[in-house]
Regions:
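Conserved strand-to-loop turn within each blade of WD40 beta-propeller repeats
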Residues: 17-20, 61-64, 116-118, 162-163
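Short loop/turn segments that connect beta-strands within beta-propeller blades
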Residues: 28-31, 72-75, 128-130
Length: 255
């Protein structure tokens, strides 16, 4: 089951993200020929993105709550960030399973933004290409569930959230930290358009992403097995007791 697709900038390779924990790199002219596999995720691979400006590097995310950096032609993993290690203990979703539903990239500063399914937060990283690693920068918290995020060159990070009164937030780096900027004429105009089509937007963007149903099923068979075993033993003991206690004169078991 394919969950995402990317094409290398030179159009030589097709990259596919799989529910079965792997990323496959195939030749575009002959997709049955596999160049490499990127292996390491322990859950479904939700999103992949070839880093703009760095055609040899691939970003991937997964239901295992990691962001990974690859040299995809060789299938070599360069770096892995565990998102759970970035969470504060007091955050209400600290123990919740989540997957990244969007990866977006700002080429101007090699900035990576991650949107996690159902969480009111956006994670920000910086790609250090010379050192082949991802550097965590900050979290952007929001009061409402975030539906989508996208960078616009020359503008900043657009954040679409589940709030009819304030559906759109524009964030920019200020003093080295990203933050929401005062509402501009552009934000007001686009927000007014979104409010006018809120029912359609809510039905589309506000729906379930479907990622929650992709996790591997884990069954605690031991508990049910032991219960059934105990029931069988009790039944066997009952049958044995009945066989060893023949009925008395009145048809009742002897005591």
């Amino acid at each position: 089951m394919l969950l995402d697709v990317a094409v290398s900038p030179d159009d030589r390779y097709v990259l596919t993200a799989d529910r079965d924990e792997k990323i496959r790199v195939s030749w575009a002219t002959a997709p049955h020929n596999i160049e490499s596999f990127c292996l390491g995720h322990t859950e479904f691979v939700s999103r992949i993105l070839v880093a703009p400006g760095h055609p040899e590097l691939l970003l991937s995310s997964s239901g295992d709550r990691t962001l990974r950096l690859w040299e995809y032609r060789s299938g070599r993993q360069l770096h892995c960030c565990h998102l759970t290690s970035l969470q504060e203990p007091a955050e209400p979703w600290g123990d919740k399973r989540f997957a990244v539903s969007r990866i977006t990239y700002w080429r101007q500063e090699d900035c990576v933004a991650l949107l996690c399914d159902s969480l009111p937060v956006v994670y920000l990283f910086q790609l250090d290409a010379p050192r082949q690693q991802l550097v965590y920068r900050q979290q952007l918290p929001f009061q409402h569930r975030v539906w989508d995020v996208a960078f616009e060159e020359g503008q900043g990070l657009w954040v679409l959230q589940d709030c009819r009164e304030e559906p759109l937030v524009l964030c920019r780096p200020v003093g080295g930290q990203w933050q929401g900027v005062p509402e501009s004429a552009v934000v007001r105009r686009v927000s007014a358009h979104l409010r006018g089509n809120w029912a359609a937007l809510e039905g589309c963007a506000g729906g379930d992403s479907g990622l929650s149903g992709l996790y591997k099923a884990t069954c605690d068979n031991m508990t049910s097995y032991l219960k059934r075993k105990e029931e069988r033993l009790q039944q066997q003991l009952e049958r044995k007791r009945r066989r060893t206690c023949p009925p008395g004169p009145a048809g009742r078991p002897r005591r």
